[in-house]
Swiss-Prot record:
Gene Ontology terms, MF aspect: transmembrane transporter activity; vitamin transmembrane transporter activity
Membrane-spanning ranges: 21-43, 65-87, 94-113, 117-139, 152-174, 241-263, 283-305, 310-329
Biological classification of the source: Bacteria, Pseudomonadati, Pseudomonadota, Gammaproteobacteria, Enterobacterales
The name this protein goes by in its record: Vitamin B12 import system permease protein BtuC
Pfam family, one: FecCD
Function per UniProt: Part of the ABC transporter complex BtuCDF involved in vitamin B12 import. Involved in the translocation of the substrate across the membrane.
Top-rank lineage group of the source organism: Bacteria
Length: 335
């Protein structure tokens, strides 16, 4: 009885600590949103948000962009956490395993075939199909146990390099100005996002919320196939549903902002290091932290140069690469 009471008390203490972390992440997200609405070539502080310039810069330009950044950051971070559980690989991430590049190839192909005249919903659908196809290929390797985790990571990186090369060749031989601009966009950026793209931004929200509610299933799946089946989890059904959700999030994110790496890799690991290990609360934490971190990266991309805007993919890669190397060393040390 005492052991049971002690276990219950420890669970309650862990839950309270997790909720404190989640509250802190929400505060960080709101702070990042405040900075994002103020920052730019012209800094506009809250007391001037309802002036003539504030109505233009804050409400018409920065607010829709910030909403898109939050949803894309949340989508990539949650997708990364789900992929790490689904592939049983701590280094799985949409950008690193080539899923985002697969979406990019499909999108570039659609631009080429449509001569730059296709509507945004068609391009988004193509990006989703590309992300789904790449995720399904990787999942088939995992389910058949043909590759170790390290080999799967290398295959994903190789597929991503192939996709990146295909996009580069397409742009090199194209005479279309739209496609050359698209190549810059594929480096990651939100400069073209305004209120017209908010239907795509809102399309991310229900999928992110649904994934955040599947922590219990992911906890069961992490116990192993046999234990998960004994607990009543249909692995085939849930794998397909999770792959579909990941493809949807990554495809729409690529259609909105291009390929942005390392958010899906670094955010879940940092949160686990702080003690958020239960998937039921880790996924929500990833959504808040992913949105906040990408907002701050977007502020850096907008303000670090006075005459131009950096691609946000460059900022996240610069900040994420050292952390990725550290994670590789740490995972090897744990093994």
């Amino acid at each position: 009885m005492q052991t049971s009471q002690l276990f219950t008390a420890l669970q309650q203490r862990q839950r309270q600590r997790d909720y404190r972390y989640l509250t802190g992440l929400v505060v960080m997200l709101l702070f990042a949103l405040l900075i994002s609405l103020c920052a730019g070539d012209v800094w506009i502080w809250p007391e001037h948000w309802f002036s003539e310039s504030g109505k233009l810069f804050v409400w018409q330009l920065r607010l829709p962009r910030s909403m898109a950044v939050i949803m894309v950051g949340a989508s990539l971070a949650v997708s990364g956490a789900v992929m790490q559980a689904l592939f049983e690989n701590p280094l799985a991430e949409p950008g690193l395993l080539g899923v985002a590049n697969g979406a990019g190839v499909a999108l570039v192909t659609a631009v080429l075939l449509g001569h730059g005249l296709l509507p945004i919903w068609v391009l988004s659908t193509c990006a989703i199909i590309g992300a789904l196809l790449m995720t399904s290929i990787l999942l088939s390797f995992t389910r058949r146990r043909l590759l170790t985790n390290a080999q799967l990571l290398l295959v994903g990186v190789a597929l991503g390099i192939i996709c990146s090369a295909m996009m580069t060749w397409a742009v090199y031989f194209s005479t279309s100005l739209d496609l050359r601009q698209l190549m810059y966009w594929m480096m990651g950026g939100f400069s073209g996002v305004d209120w017209r793209q908010q239907s795509l931004v809102l399309a991310l929200l229900p999928t992110v919320i649904w994934l955040c509610c599947q922590g219990r299933v992911l906890n069961f799946m992490s116990l192993g196939e046999q234990q998960a089946r004994q607990l009543g989890v249909s692995l085939h059904l849930w794998r397909n549903l999770l792959v579909l959700a990941i493809g949807l999030l990554v495809g729409i994110s690529v259609a909105l902002a291009g390929v942005i790496s390392f958010i899906g890799l670094v955010i879940p690991h940092i949160l686990r290091l702080t003690g958020l290990t239960d998937q039921r609360r880790l996924l929500a934490g990833c959504a808040f932290a992913g949105g906040g971190v990408l907002l701050l990266a977007d502020v850096v991309a907008r303000t670090v140069l006075s005459s131009a805007e950096l691609p946000i993919g460059v900022v996240t890669a610069t900040l994420g690469s050292p952390l990725f190397i550290w994670l590789l060393i740490r995972v090897k040390g744990v093994k």
